[in-house]
């Protein structure tokens, strides 16, 4: 069994110029606001993980759209995507987060509980082009097991 606890994803989900945020219930950002996300499961692609995590944590259905940023550290990586809002109203899972809600993006950026990294990601979002998922897949490879963002 592989160990995917070092591979994580988060998503910027906008609805009516409001960003989806969660208040974390654990870890180094306990009590702070961040964009929702989580770890990949074994044999799970990042876009599937993002859609699953956001649904589990907030009851919001999304579709992964583009890659905004990726952060590498010595012991992990974290990919940040945009995701299109499809349906649902935010409901916290009460396990990993105590709150889930949409907040005006300008209010989010000035909120004292927003994590520094989330603030930086939101500030940079829209200032530069994001990478879009390509339909390209090399011959002989299952498209469900391959992703290319350009």
Walk through the language-model features, giving the residues of each.
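A conserved beta-turn-beta hairpin within the catalytic core of GNAT-like acetyltransferases
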Residues: 27-31, 77
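A short gly/proline-enriched turn/hairpin at secondary-structure junctions
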Residues: 34-35
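Short polar/acidic secondary-structure junctions
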Residues: 25-27, 72-73
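Beta-strand scaffold of nucleotide-dependent catalytic cores
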Residues: 21-23
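Unchanged
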Residues: 40-64, 73-124, 148-150
